Amino acid sequence: MFLSIKRKIIEPYLVIRQSLAPLKLSRWQLTKIMARTAFDGLPSGTLIVLAALSLALLVAVLRIKSQERTRSKEIPGLPVVKRNHLHYLDIVREGRELYPGQPFMAVNKRHSLVVFPPSCFNEIKRLPAHTASAKKFFNTTNYGDWSHVGEESPELIKSVIADLTRSLPARVHTRQDECRDVFDEVVGRRREWKEFPLLMTTFEIITQINACSFVGKTLATNRSWVRSVMMLPVFIHVGVMLLDACPLIVRPFMAYLTFLPSIKNRWDLTRMLAPVLKKDLEEYHEAKDKKEFLRPRAEGKVPFTGFLLSHYKSAQASLKQLISDYIHLSFDSTPNTAAVMFHALCELAIHPEAVEALRQELDEVMVDGKLPPTHLQELRKMDSFLRECFRLHPFGIFTLQRRVEQPVQLSVGPLLPPGTLMAVDGQAIDGSSELWPNPEKFDVYRFYNLRQKLGNENQYHFATTSPDSPGWGDGTQACPGRFFAVNTLKIAMAHFLRNYDIEIKPECLPLKTKPMPSGFFSPDDRAIARIRART
């Protein structure tokens, strides 16, 4: 065989190479001549056949990869609950009734994942990220190669959970002033009732309040910036929905088209962020005392670029990486916080007794209109109110969403192979009559009263992660920004309660939350609120 290869391939190649040596051709030029000679000698139609076979192979590979990214394979020994629905709501209810205390495979029209009962909460939360990853779950279900969801760097997460959280008490009064300015711009100070589309109004308020801390007030009030941040999750959601609706075989070819608005939006955010971050880089490198530069400060914006640079190695801290981190920061901190505030304002409108209780607490805690420069644990009733809103209106059906990276065997169910998507039934926790008396009822004092009991002083906080508080996740992969989100919500709600009244138009009630294919809930975007200034 070797002699045949030598005679038919190697020797002709050497002859041609020696013949062309005087021309001093490069290897690339010589390769092109050889390839052209080979293809010219092929029978007519061979190229078409080869191209068709190559295309078929490419499509087959892409189809397999696409299917692996959107669905978990059926697992022997695991029951399957399948419906041709666009959401998981009824599927999970059925599985909960058919297989109590057992895992099952939930399959809807777009996705599939293994749903575990609440009894497995602690087992799953203890799994390390290299075994079962939350980021990989969201990256997979949101086509992360295009949306960039789930690509947060470890340095970004460290900066949020440690440095940003530590800076919050010093910034309470500054954030109050920023909050006041945002409400004045978005809502105004009119004594007459005025109608607002509540979801987008809260979205805009949270976008601007958060941006004041991260990118400074100038960019935070720039309409192009505000619009781009608000549209970032919208464009990603639309791209995911459109690509989910495409047949598996064409998804790889449609991805660029469906995510084109999202890609354009990231370009816009990059263009606006670049000059701000270049200035941050200069200030950080010019600072002689880096510890003093990173010290929590009351004025100006949070030195978040400095936080990031203190965690990155110098070679990693490029402008491109910082821009990516800031886009992730804006995406992760805005829509979920806005959704909680939306539901909190709705509950204020529906439950006027809660309004009076919360205003009374604010009068007791605030001094000259200022909140204490702490993590705001003093607002116990506010904390209970927000957690009750979160319990009744969670982000979605599931908690502890994970993508299995290494084989996993829990106390119940079969061995889960790598690539499996799994989650815990969080809705069963929030609606459990064993945990919460009258779970369908809104009770502003539910968690306030629980904390009054001896030994519960440090439990049942809004930001608590535990098996009875599924909203933030738990363990080492819990939401790193939950303390910042709670701080934002308490400051915003305190300002609203002291300065505004709210009603929901009767024709918008009851509010209708829409389940999405991924298992998350979409707040009612039809809700119209009537708001007026109190003074």
UniProtKB/Swiss-Prot annotation:
Pathway: Mycotoxin biosynthesis. Its cofactor is heme. GO terms for molecular function: heme binding; iron ion binding; monooxygenase activity; oxidoreductase activity, acting on paired donors, with incorporation or reduction of molecular oxygen. GO terms for cellular component: membrane. CDD domains: CYP503A1-like (cd11041). Its main location: membrane. The keyword Ligase does not apply. Signal peptide: none annotated. SUPFAM superfamilies: Cytochrome P450 (SSF48264). It comes from the Eukaryota. Heme binds at residue 479. One of its GO terms (biological process) is secondary metabolic process. It is an enzyme of class 1 (oxidoreductase). Belongs to the cytochrome P450 family. Cytochrome P450 monooxygenase; part of the gene cluster that mediates the biosynthesis of the mycotoxin pyrichalasin H, a tyrosine-derived cytochalasan that inhibits the growth of rice seedlings, but also inhibits lymphocyte capping and actin polymerization and alters cell morphology. Pyrichalasin H is indicated as the responsible agent for the genus-specific pathogenicity of M.grisea toward crabgrass. The first step in the pathway is catalyzed by the O-methyltransferase pyiA which methylates free tyrosine to generate the precursor O-methyltyrosine. This is Pyrichalasin C-18 hydroxylase. It comes from Pyricularia grisea (Crabgrass-specific blast fungus). The lineage of its organism: Eukaryota, Fungi, Dikarya, Ascomycota, Pezizomycotina. The gene is pyiD.
